[in-house]
Amino acid sequence: MLGLTEAEKIKICLQKQVNSSFSLHNGFGGNLYATEEKRMFELVKPKAGASVLNQSTWIGFGDSRTDQSNSAFPRSADVSAKTADKFRSLSGGSLMLSMFGPPGKVDYLYQGCGKHKVFYEGVNWSPHAAIDCYRKNWTDIKLNFQKSIYELASQSHCMSLVNALDKTIPLQVTKGVAKNCNNSFLKNPALYTQEVKPLEQICGEENLAFFTLPTQFGTYECKLHLVASCYFIYDSKEVYNKRGCGNYFQVIYDSSGKVVGGLDNRVSPYTGNSGDTPTMQCDMLQLKPGRYSVRSSPRFLLMPERSYCFDMKEKGPVTAVQSIWGKGRESDTAVDQACSSTPGCMLIQKQKPYIGEADDHHGDQEMRELLSGLDYEARCISQSGWVNETSPFTEEYLLPPKFGRCPLAAKEESIPKIPDGLLIPTSGTDTTVTKPKSRIFGIDDLIIGLLFVAIVEAGIGGYLLGSRKESGGGVTKESAEKGFEKIGNDIQILRSSTNIAIEKLNDRISHDEQAIRDLTLEIENARSEALLGELGIIRALLVGNISIGLQESLWELASEITNRAGDLAVEVSPGCWIIDNNICDQSCQNFIFKFNETAPVPTIPPLDTKIDLQSDPFYWGSSLGLAITAAISLAALVISGIAICRTK
């Protein structure tokens, strides 16, 4: 280049832009000044009602409110046609009606498979049904039945009613009926009677019968059966046998002779009440497949003839929907109580009375809204509702049970903020960039760019190092290594400290349910605090990587200017050039520094800064993926801030 006199020199630099409107963001290996900032995540609010994690892996069991074959459908339904198609339903039916088979009631073969099971049935066996059969009020039996169904369903992929058990009954008995059972009797248990003419101490023969619980029913595998062990309860021996010969007993034995259910008044006392009519009690037994025997005192034999079978192959969520009548009909709370006392069961309850559209009892708008989420897939389902947003934080603690990628409770002000808008890098403390060191721009250097930060979902993938595109731009692996090493170490420290705290909390577990709930809440809070800490580390790493990337991008821009200038300009310091005003006039300067004011600055490839936080099942309780992608684009606007400074 020709020598230049002082009078001919013009110094062109990148103008300083930082002022009081900028905020400083510190990061690993580099800092940023920014005109704006935003939280890494916003708080989400759960939607009330039911939803599912996967549309292809759930099944429902219902009645007329989910029955597409009902003549009043869809006005009679509380779900959409799409959701009704997922239900196994029949108007007038219920799982308990099919289990016991009272005379004159709907008897439907409930069966199906799904990881998540939704139960919206039960109202058809309620006080309004007025089922007697030696029992004026069946609510406590219904409660135990529904609870057992929910418990076993939560551990099984498939379930089915077994409506005909193989059995062997004694020759001396015949099918019996009862006046208070519509002159008939239940299909399960079946009543068998023995005609006897009692003499002193002689009351007929003891009944001995057998039934077999199958290992398979049709295509359904049976690892465990729910069996109703029913027996009569007498207030006194005299009520059972007025001549005083013998005591009542009805006992079920397994193949080894062990008692598994029933009542034996030979060893257990009578109630001592003053009633003259027995009542029937039914206990819910969970029995493995096999051959069982039933022994009963003369006169009466109650024989198990049905069961529900479960394959016990897969644990999954259970949702129970409150099943009540509209005005004028008496309901019970058995479904509510059963679900609330069963681990893993989410209860959906109305806040208002049931008001139907098709009639008083079918097509309630509030219930339709609560069940509308069954049309969608959620990221998280819980007792508090369902969430489909990707944010890991919610304002309120989500009540258990909960499944999926559930957000943790956090205060908005505790969520870290990341820089946004106009960004200017500082040189920071990074020493791994080697292009060359004099090229690293400090706080006195300008860059005007647009930063687009998108928070996207990612699967479990461990920690991914930032990568540099072959064509230039982005973060070098070397410049990110120290930051990633630090984030890895800090996260391990956080997790170790949290796990130690959780172990201490475990020592405080007692059998008191409230203490366990309190413990669960404390663990959730510990998880939230740890995640916020990890996000703080991620934010610092992100800021550092963006800062380094911007510095590199600025260096590439400076290199482009130097290359265009050739011998017409001398770079005297990072971002500053001296030219001869007589040799390079305004149009020449426009060509070098403003690219003729026509061609944009070549777009810098996106800054690839991805981080996947791998979830630890013990630590998080569900799979949680975070990915932060930062992209930087420089346009012709970059050059518009260049100022010309004359030096003599």
From Swiss-Prot:
Subcellular location(s) of the protein: Virion membrane; Host cell membrane
Active-site residues, record numbering mapped to chain: 64, 359, 362
Main location: virion
Region N-acetyl-9-O-acetylneuraminic acid binding, residue ranges: 151-303
PTM info: In natural infection, inactive HEF is matured into HEF1 and HEF2 outside the cell by one or more trypsin-like, arginine-specific endoprotease.
Top EC class of this enzyme: hydrolase
Topology, Cytoplasmic side: 645-648
SUPFAM superfamilies: Influenza hemagglutinin (stalk), SGNH hydrolase, Viral protein domain
Gene3D superfamilies: 2.20.70.20, 3.90.20.10
Keywords: Disulfide bond, Fusion of virus membrane with host endosomal membrane, Fusion of virus membrane with host membrane, Glycoprotein, Hemagglutinin, Host cell membrane, Host membrane, Host-virus interaction, Hydrolase, Membrane, Signal, Transmembrane, Transmembrane helix, Viral attachment to host cell, Viral envelope protein, Viral penetration into host cytoplasm, Virion, Virus endocytosis by host, Virus entry into host cell
Pfam families on file: Hema_esterase (PF03996), Hema_HEFG (PF02710), Hema_stalk (PF08720)
Extracellular side: 8-623
Keyword Disulfide bond in record: yes
Protein name: Hemagglutinin-esterase-fusion glycoprotein
Gene behind this protein: HE
